[in-house]
Amino acid sequence: GTLLLRFPIFYNSGKVVPFIDSLFTTVSAICVTGLSTVDMSVYTDAGFFVIMLLIEAGGLGLVSFFTIYLMFASKKISLLNRNIIKDYFTEDSQIEVRQIIKLIVCLTFGFQLIGGTVLAIFLKAHGEENFIFYGLFLAVSAFCNAGFAPYSDSLAQFAHSPEIYLVI
């Protein structure tokens, strides 16, 4: 991610992102902290795509890790709680890691697609030209709890648009 964000195609012309800032943005995206040492509007849509993929990888990694951890930790919890966890994830109580990961990925993408679609509709109503991509970017960022936004003012421009905040 760091090296990709260093290529001129990923940031706006006339603006150079120092290596340390590219590294910080990459780590922040993967760790889903949402911190940035640069104005996020410095990145192009291609740059936001890279950042979105990093957020997605970090978010899916965290959710998958904790789900698998709960599966194995359930061996140390009561029989009732173990059965609740098993029943929650599969009907036949035969938990397999691959099935759980597949379920997590499908649900994650499904929720993000729904959120992105709704956000795109609202962003279009607000005159955003790139409403589809920015809707998806915001949905991924919100779902993974990353807190990144593709605007220089974060989401302040939508301060009087509760519909956008409700979706996020």
Residue ranges of predicted features:
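Membrane-proximal intracellular helices of multi-pass ion channels
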Residues: 1-168
